[in-house]
């Protein structure tokens, strides 16, 4: 079989009746002396195909699934850094997944953005590898999942329904554990982040001045990013590990948090959790066990298997919340814990793996923090979204992508589709000082379907830039229930989502990120279309739909209004960064 070592033993897995013609599944044995137990069955609730593999004796096993490729156009794999535009070969490199390195989830996309097959998997041990690509000899999609069964079983989930893309992804997402209980409302409030606007050069007076402006714009949270814990501005991580507020940057952490709270703003502090900086007191005095050094970062990575390490971090971070009154933490760099276990273990190790110990650290921290701050707000970011980490966070942010609206958009939509219950946040939005209001709007459009984080010097913007930010903050706040909790529909998956639509009750909001034709919703009373490109807006209606319309530019200024019957194709001259609002009259 193409893509399979001919020395490996392969065993066909019988599939249940009632499936579309064509799919087949096999086990590829790498290490087990005996064949693992494999059961395939259709789930009676969601109709997905579940393949469960177990082997008490352990060993590495691969589950291979082959599906005929008909009308395939692209392979969707969630992640802001993924290329969604093509079809990789079956011999492409494996992708490695762990609790701190994403989740194996994907969909083969056919014409009109319809799924051919949607797939995912979960290994009880948390680690597995996935390979997905086209078999050129047979015109099939090969999806292979490999896991070590000594850590527990492996379950593969397939959805063969060629219906709605978002619905298919949702069924597989839920089956592999990527849904958590809905988080509290404060996690969905817009965020002013200090990173791109200050970097480490924090200034308390300037921060407070900008916070006052942010509060007037509708922001609800301030993230005090890297820099609060160090007296220098050198961008390294040599000061990490003590996690005490540096008085030269913030004279009184509790007073600052209290003043921000008086403005209606919650405060989160950034922490580079794994790092033990070479210049920290903890590095010099405590002799904490480490996994490895990162000289370029001026730090070592702590070994979470050590009870002393976990105790140190829990004590320091809980004290930070208790002493300042902060609402939570932005926990960064957790992917540093996603490593294979070193040969040597610290003396106070309980026998768990590095990954399991890191998860235990997060649990200990949550329990301790909750005692001083009920329901703490916790931010994680790509790539550490997984079934294991999702329930340990309340906010999931797109990976760093400064000045990249496309990556922000793709990351937000991917996380919205691939997870449920958590608040999905943009990477902090920034723009150049000379950017036009239309360009500023383009950056803000990128975060429409997630919670916007902004990191820009609010006191350094032109009147037009400020007006654009205020307009879009007002728009997002007014429509956040639809944007965040409406049913998502995407167009142009292989084109980084040419259009995205959210619908809730009788309101539909469509953002066109490229010149496309958007179809009028059949039952909505209000249709809002955002022009996130440079051309006119084209709409299509299968039947005459009389409507009242208004058009505003990116600063919120009305440029046109009137009445129009949508019938067939209709063009509207909406300025770049502007909004078309249609209110349909009863027919």
What are these regions (language model features)?
Residues 1-178, 523-526, 538-551, 555-556, ...:
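N-terminal accessory beta-strand-rich subdomains and adjacent acidic, glycine-rich linkers
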Residues 165-179, 221-226, 248-298, 375-380, ...:
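Glycine-rich, aromatic-flanked loop segments that form ligand/cofactor-binding clefts
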Residues 361-577, 583-585:
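Active-site-proximal substrate-binding groove within the catalytic cores of carbohydrate-active enzymes
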Residues 228-253, 280-304, 335-359, 365:
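Aromatic- and acidic-residue-enriched carbohydrate-binding clefts of CAZyme catalytic domains
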Residues 189, 196-200, 266-323, 414-415:
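Active-site-adjacent "subsite" loops/lids of carbohydrate-active enzymes
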Residues 206-231, 323, 327:
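Catalytic domains of carbohydrate-active enzymes, especially glycoside hydrolases
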Residues 199-204, 245-250, 274-277, 385-388, ...:
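Acidic-and-aromatic substrate-binding clefts and catalytic sites of carbohydrate-active enzymes
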Residues 199, 217, 226, 260, ...:
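Active-site and adjacent substrate-binding regions of carbohydrate-active enzymes
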């Amino acid at each position: 079989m193409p893509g399979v070592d001919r020395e490996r033993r392969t065993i066909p897995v019988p599939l249940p009746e009632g499936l579309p013609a064509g799919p087949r599944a096999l086990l590829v044995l790498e290490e087990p002396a005996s064949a693992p137990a494999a059961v395939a069955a259709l789930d009676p609730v969601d109709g997905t195909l579940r393949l469960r593999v177990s082997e008490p004796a352990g060993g590495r096993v691969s589950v291979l699934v082959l599906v005929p490729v008909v009308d395939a156009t692209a392979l969707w794999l969630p992640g802001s850094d993924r290329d969604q535009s093509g079809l990789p070969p079956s011999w492409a490199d494996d992708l490695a997944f762990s609790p701190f390195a994403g989740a194996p989830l994907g969909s083969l996309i056919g014409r009109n953005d319809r799924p051919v097959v949607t797939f995912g998997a979960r290994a009880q041990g948390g680690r597995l590898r996935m390979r997905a690509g086209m078999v050129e000899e047979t015109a099939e999609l090969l999806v292979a999942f490999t896991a070590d069964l000594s850590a527990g079983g492996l379950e593969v989930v397939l959805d063969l329904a060629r219906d709605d893309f978002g619905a298919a992804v949702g069924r597989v997402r839920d089956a592999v554990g990527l849904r958590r209980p809905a988080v509290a409302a404060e996690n969905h409030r817009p965020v002013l982040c200090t990173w791109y606007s200050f970097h480490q050069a924090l200034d308390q007076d300037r921060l407070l001045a900008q916070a006052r402006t942010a509060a007037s714009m509708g922001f609800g949270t301030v993230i005090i990013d890297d820099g609060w814990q160090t007296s220098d501005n050198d961008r390294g991580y040599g000061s990490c590990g003590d996690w005490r507020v540096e008085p030269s940057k913030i004279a009184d952490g509790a007073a600052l948090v209290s003043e921000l709270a008086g403005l209606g703003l919650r405060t989160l502090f950034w922490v580079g959790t794994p790092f033990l900086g070479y210049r920290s007191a903890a590095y010099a005095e405590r002799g904490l066990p480490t996994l490895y050094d990162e000289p370029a970062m001026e730090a070592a990575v702590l070994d979470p298997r050590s009870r002393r390490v976990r105790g140190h971090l829990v004590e320091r971070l809980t004290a930070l919340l208790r002493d300042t009154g902060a609402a939570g933490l932005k926990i960064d760099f957790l992917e540093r814990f996603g490593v294979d276990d070193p040969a040597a273990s610290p003396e106070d190790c309980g026998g768990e793996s590095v990954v399991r110990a890191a998860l235990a650290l997060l649990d200990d921290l949550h329990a301790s923090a909750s005692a001083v701050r009920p329901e703490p707000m916790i931010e994680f970011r790509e790539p550490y979204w997984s079934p294991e980490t999702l329930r340990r966070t309340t906010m999931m942010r797109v990976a760093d992508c400064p000045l990249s609206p496309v990556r922000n958009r793709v990351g937000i939509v991917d996380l919205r589709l691939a997870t449920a219950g958590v608040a999905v946040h943009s990477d902090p939005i920034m723009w150049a000082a000379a950017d036009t209001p239309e360009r500023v709007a383009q950056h803000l459009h990128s975060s429409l379907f997630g919670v916007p984080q902004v990191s820009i010097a609010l006191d350094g913007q032109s009147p037009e830039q400020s007006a654009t930010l205020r307009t879009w903050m007002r728009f997002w706040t007014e429509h956040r229930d639809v944007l965040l909790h409406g049913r998502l529909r995407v167009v142009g998956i292989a084109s980084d989502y040419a259009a995205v639509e959210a619908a809730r009750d009788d309101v539909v909001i469509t953002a066109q990120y490229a010149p496309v034709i958007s179809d009028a919703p059949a039952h909505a009373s209000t249709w809002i279309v955002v022009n996130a490109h440079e051309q006119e807006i084209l709409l299509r209606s299968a039947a005459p739909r009389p409507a009242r319309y208004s058009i505003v530019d990116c600063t919120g200024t009305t440029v046109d209004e009137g009445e129009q019957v949508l019938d067939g194709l209709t063009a509207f001259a909406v300025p770049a960064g502007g909004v078309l609002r249609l209110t349909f009259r009863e027919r």
